[in-house]
UniProtKB/Swiss-Prot annotation:
The keyword Methyltransferase does not apply. It holds the Pfam family MraZ. HAMAP family: MraZ (MF_01008). It comes from Ureaplasma parvum serovar 3 (strain ATCC 700970). The gene is mraZ. GO terms for cellular component: cytoplasm; nucleoid. The keyword Acetylation does not apply. This is Transcriptional regulator MraZ. InterPro entries: MraZ, MraZ_C, MraZ_dom, MraZ_N, MraZ_sf, SpoVT-AbrB_dom, SpoVT-AbrB_sf.
């Protein structure tokens, strides 16, 4: 399970140092999968979690046009990235641009993945979500989640 929030930054070459606590949760992995997230962030998954994610999409919407389109959009913007000997990953420029990352980032554990957010984008998102936290919890509890 991936948890926690880490303040970090990327360098001028779009490299992110993987925080030691994050690295510890990745185990012996030498690769991670980076893809565009649903909320303007970058998702970082281990191979097993990424494969499960794609399988879940396909199983939910077997053969549907929506499943094909979603799978196409996700896989066309997914990169298998090596964790180098200095525990850094290189984030592709198109993901940097789409996530509006300048320098400062948050790395956020969200159970089966880490999300990489531009600091400014997440600060705005977080501010808007905190006011609805109790509403979201209530709706999910009513639905048995």
């Amino acid at each position: 399970m991936f948890i926690g929030t880490y303040n970090h930054s990327i360098d001028s070459k779009n490299r992110m140092l993987v925080p030691s606590k994050v690295k510890a949760t990745l185990g012996e992995a030498i690769f991670v999968y980076l893809s565009l997230g649903f909320d303007g962030n970058i998702d970082m998954r281990l191979e097993s979690e990424f494969n499960q994610f794609v399988n879940n999409i396909n199983n939910l919407l077997i053969g549907s046009k929506e499943a094909r389109n979603l799978t196409r959009l996700i896989l066309s913007q997914t990169y298998k990235i090596e964790i180098d000997s200095a525990s850094r990953i290189l984030i592709p420029q198109n993901l940097i641009d789409k996530a509006k990352i300048k320098k400062d980032i948050y790395i956020i554990g969200t159970n089966d993945r880490y999300e990489i957010w531009a600091k400014e984008v997440y600060d705005d998102f977080s501010l808007n979500q905190e006011s609805t936290l109790s509403d979201l919890a209530e709706k999910l509890l009513i639905n048995g989640i």
